[in-house]
Structure formats: C-alpha cells, structure tokens
C-alpha cells in the first residue's frame, strides 16, 4: 500500500477544503440562483440549510475520511461491518465527481475566456451566447483548464495543490474585498442590498426551499466525498466540528461578498437579476463596459472568478485522482495523465453542447450542462449526503458512537449529546423529504 500523503499545516487543510467548496457554486451559481428565487428569502433559507444540513454532513464526511484514511472509493469498505455493502456507494462518489467536472471545467474555461478578453481590452466585441456557440473557443479554454489543473496536481500534495491553493485563496479574498467596497459606491447599492439581504417571506415556497438545499450542498461540495479526501490527509490533533465551522464560515463569507459585488451593479444599471446562468457573463460584462475604468474592474472581477473556479477544479480533480490511484496503484503523474484525458473527453459534451453536440434533456433551452448539473446537484449531492448520514448515525452502518469518537478527537469545538437527534433523525429525514419533493416538482419538460 502506498504511504498516504499529508497536508503540511492546519491552515493548508482549511484553505484547501474551503477552496474546494468556494468556486462556481459561490460566485457563479449562487448569485443567479439567489436572483431567480427571491433574493433575501433565498439567502435566509440558504444559510439555514448550511447550518442545519451542510454543517452536520461536512463533519460526517471529514470524520469518515480521517478514520478510514482512504478516498471515497474505499472509505465505506474500511469502516463497514463484515457482510455489509456500503462500499458500493464509493463508486457513486466517483461517478458524481466525474459528472461535476464534465461541466465545471467548461464553466471555468468561460470565466478564463472573459478574463483574457478584459485583460486584452477586447471585451466589447463578444457576448455569452456567441461564446458558448463557438466550438473553437470552448474546446481551447477547456483544454487549458484541464491541462493546468492536472499539471499542478502531478506534483506532490504539499508542493503542488496545498501551496497553490493558499496563494489563490488569499488573492481571491483580497480581490473580492476590493470589488465589494467598490460596488458599495454605486447609486443603486442600497436597493440592490435590500433585494439581496432583506427576506420577502411571500416568495418562500417548496421550490425555493429545494433550490436552497441543493445550492448549500453544491456550494460546500459535500455528499460526493470531496471533503472526505481532505479529511484523510490530516492528523487527529483537531476536533472536526470546529474545522467544519471554519470552512463553512469562509465559504459563506465569499458567497455573501459575491452578491454584494453583483446586485448593487445590477440595480444601478437596470439589469435583470433573474438572468440565470448568464448573470455573471453578459450582465456583469455589460456593467463593466459602461463603467469608468470598466476594463480594469472587469479584469479584476474575472480574475477572482478564475481563482474561485480553479480552486474547486483542483479540489475535485484531486478527489478523482485519489480514487483512481487507490483503484489502480498508479503514480501521481500517470494518474494525472489518464484522468486529465478522460475528463477532457467527457467535458467535450458540455463544451460542444451549444453547437455541434446539441442535446435538450429537459425543458426547451436545456443542454448538456443542465443534464450533468441535474445528475450532480439534484441526485448525487443530496443522495450522497443521505447515505453518509445513515452510515454515520445508524447501527446498520459505522454507528453514532464511533462517528462521535472520531469527530471529537483533538482540540476544539466538539459534538454534544443534544446534537444526536439532529444528526440521527432530522438531517436524513429533511434530506430525503426535500429530495423527493424536488424530483416531484422538477421541470422535466
């Protein structure tokens, strides 16, 4: 068995976990989901879902990974009791991570494309619809993203992924603070913040609740083993409740900042906050094109977007790489080559899905991106979280006592006895109910 790699510091662990969580889910998907689902109402439900569902599942995932000292492909097998078959869910984790990269790498390429356009001053001659329909642009930038990710991952854990993520996360936070402060100077800042932060309870319904839960899991990257792999890279000197809280606070801080950057700009320039996936492309690009010094503000904006998206690409690809290496025994370089080629080929479905590989899986206007997102956000993330909750808290799985003993090992915030009903009953029941409701109300056609 290969000796397990280790992260060099607690800061590296928190930054790497937060980097995996912070990404397109926070700075691309969260703002347009918030805009489409009532602004402040969605924000309130999202934060509640983070606290009562996201935090418990993250603690469970860290605990299982650290106890098993394995990637998701084997972590259930190492902790399950003789004769059980929980290990089958490790394969689902691998499928979910690959499906996520089938569209996430393409979206990261879009962001990189916009960054290059603003940096070179050619930001006025392109639009989102034209870009996604251009096969050459999509394939080229997808290739750049995948190659960059797996070249970085080919180095050892501390010298490659951990070091790069620390620098990227620091730069990301600095850039976001600068952009948020600038956005607060807009004439429509007060109106934008009111929409974003003040709940309108009349807009809360079942669809919004399901959207908030799916977004919470998507944003935190829990349910697919992304956090478990980082848990397997750390020692037992810190209790996991506190570590999870740090990651979620950082993740939420970035999501809130993203809205502060975007919504004041939308209300200042009279732009539609319900624009959907194009909100951060056509909408924000339009804002910068009409703003004094807009080229440079746009460059900074899409630079922070690149850092955010690439941090998640690196984290998820590390998870895929770890699982494949455990299955095959390959070295890091060989695993990176094979995984990189495989993800690139699969992601071509999304990259070409608006042109030569057009595919409409659901309602009119849907494409490959929606198909992969449906698999991940609507299925693998909630079902993976449900399986994890049942495994950790049920006598049929690892069991509550073993889970708590692992989670509470080390210094810091610990699980308390009063939390047992929340973890054991509320979390799995809430996830199951919301999942079934979401499937029943999904816009299939």
State what each model feature region is.
Residues 1-29, 57-62, 66-88, 235-239, ...:
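Membrane-interface "cap" regions at the ends of multi-pass membrane proteins
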Residues 6-17, 42-45, 84-98, 141-145, ...:
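Select transmembrane alpha-helical segments in multipass membrane proteins
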Residues 11-49, 225-231, 241-245, 249-252, ...:
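Transmembrane helix-boundary motif of multi-pass solute transporters/channels
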Residues 33-37, 88-97, 144-168, 229-237, ...:
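Membrane-water interface regions at transmembrane-helix termini and the short interhelical loops
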Residues 361-362, 367-392, 412-445:
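A generic transmembrane alpha-helix motif of multi-pass inner-membrane proteins
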Residues 3-5, 32-37, 67-92, 105-160, ...:
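Inter-helical loop and helix-membrane interface segments of multi-pass membrane transporters/permeases
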Residues 2-3, 7, 162, 166-310, ...:
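Membrane-embedded translocation segments of transport machinery
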């Amino acid at each position: 068995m290969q000796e397990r790699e280790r992260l060099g510091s607690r800061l590296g662990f928190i930054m790497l976990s937060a980097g995996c969580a912070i990404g397109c889910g926070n700075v691309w998907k969260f703002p347009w989901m918030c805009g489409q689902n009532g602004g402040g109402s969605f924000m309130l439900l999202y934060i509640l879902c983070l606290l009562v569902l996201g935090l418990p599942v993250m603690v469970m995932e860290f605990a299982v990974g650290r106890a098993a000292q394995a990637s998701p492909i084997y972590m259930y097998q190492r902790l399950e009791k003789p004769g059980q078959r929980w290990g089958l869910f490790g394969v689902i984790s691998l499928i979910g991570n690959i499906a996520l990269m089938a569209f996430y790498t393409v979206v990261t390429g879009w962001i990189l494309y916009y960054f290059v356009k603003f940096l070179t001053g050619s930001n006025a001659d392109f639009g989102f619809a034209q870009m996604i329909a251009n096969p050459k642009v999509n394939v080229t930038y997808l290739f750049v993203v995948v190659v960059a990710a797996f070249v970085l991952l080919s180095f050892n854990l501390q010298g490659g992924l951990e070091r790069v993520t620390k620098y990227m996360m620091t730069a990301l936070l600095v850039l976001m603070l600068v952009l948020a402060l600038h956005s607060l100077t807009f004439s429509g800042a007060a109106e934008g913040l009111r929409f974003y932060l003040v709940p309108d309870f009349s807009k809360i319904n079942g669809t919004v609740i399901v959207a908030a839960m799916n977004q919470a899991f998507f944003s935190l990257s829990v349910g697919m083993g992304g956090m478990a792999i980082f848990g397997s890279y750390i020692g037992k000197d810190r209790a996991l409740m506190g570590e999870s809280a740090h990651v979620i606070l950082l993740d939420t801080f970035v999501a809130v900042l993203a809205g502060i950057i975007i919504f004041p700009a939308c209300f200042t320039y009279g732009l539609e906050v319900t624009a959907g996936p194009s909100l951060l492309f056509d909408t924000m690009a339009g804002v910068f094109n009409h703003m004094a010094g807009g080229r440079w503000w746009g460059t900074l904006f899409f630079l922070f977007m690149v850092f955010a998206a690439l941090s998640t690409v690196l984290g998820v690809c590390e998870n895929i790489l770890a699982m494949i290496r455990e299955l095959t025994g390959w070295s890091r370089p060989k695993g990176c080559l094979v995984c990189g080629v495989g993800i690139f080929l699969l992601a071509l479905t999304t990259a070409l899905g608006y042109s030569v590989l057009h595919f409409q899986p659901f309602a009119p206007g849907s494409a490959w991106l929606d198909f992969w997102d449906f698999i991940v956000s609507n299925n693998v993330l909630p079902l993976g979280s449900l399986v994890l909750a049942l495994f950790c808290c049920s006598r049929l799985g690892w069991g509550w006592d073993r889970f708590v003993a692992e989670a509470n090992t080390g210094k810091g915030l610990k699980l308390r006895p009063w939390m047992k009903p929340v973890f054991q009953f509320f979390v799995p029941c809430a996830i199951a109910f919301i999942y079934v409701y979401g499937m029943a109300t999904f816009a299939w056609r």
